[in-house]
Amino acid sequence: FGDSYTNLLNEAYGKEIWYSEGIAPCNVPELTVQADESGLVGKNGPIDVANRIINSYYNGKMVMYEFQPAVAAYYDGACYAPKQLIRAWEPWSGHFVLDIGFWLAMHFSRFARKGWMYVNGACYGDGEENHAIANTTHNFMTLTAPDRSEMSMFFTNESEDVRIYTVQVKDMAFEPTVFSSVITKGPSGRQAYDANWFRIGKKIRPIRNHRDTFTIKVPPRSIMTVTTMDVSWVDGVNTFPAVQPHLSSRLALPYTENLQYTKEEI
């Protein structure tokens, strides 16, 4: 996830480094939640992938993470383990699912616009690398608008304990009075497995008598975005009510297909 050479290419030669063929989450959260109670942790899970995004910048100055693949449209189980942002396993029905990887990507892409700048002193990533990132202690990343009018921070927590951070905000073009938060975590009690994905969290206000200092508490087994941007449109997995996929259906047999597609479809 980066080394001294990728850092050199960026810092000394001004090259923009991309993380090409970055893995998408490889799990079926409605099943894995039965094993780990969150559906988010484990090797190649969504928190692991979020850690790769953060670590690839902190350790290798990689500024783009390209998911491979973004959409999976192969037959379920016919190729390899699930790996996608959008699950489209039923080409005969048109059914698709905005999977956990989609909401993971939303945490980053909707709260950091093209051209935003990384705050190197407010980025950090660690953990043990072995085709995954495990046993982390801290993983966070901060970006700001070029004119310093907006700011977003991204956190992960794969542990079973709350991670607490004290953040001092200064030299910005806005008065740091309150931050909004968006959190993805596992279900509580008898909730549905995706009940707490991409949900608005509590407002984060300054510590008393320290108007520029904030305490941020990252829940166990979660992905968290803290931002000055508008979050009023966020509504969990119902954030995009106009997106209504076709109903799932079994493949009717015998199945025939002439494989003749228009240029637009291809």
Model-predicted regions and their roles:
Residues 1-27:
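Active-site neighborhood of glycoside hydrolase catalytic domains
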Residues 199-242:
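C-terminal beta-strand-rich structural cap/linker in extracellular carbohydrate-active enzymes
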Residues 1, 20-24, 67-71, 155-158, ...:
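Active-site-proximal beta-strand/loop segments in catalytic clefts of secreted hydrolases
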Residues 170-193:
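Solvent-exposed beta-hairpin/edge-strand motifs
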Residues 2-5, 26-31, 74-77, 162-164, ...:
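Extracytoplasmic/secreted cell-surface and envelope-processing proteins
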Residues 233-266:
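Extracellular glycan-recognition regions
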Residues 121-177, 221:
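Carbohydrate-binding surface patches
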Residues 19-135:
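Aromatic/acidic polysaccharide-binding cleft in carbohydrate-active enzymes
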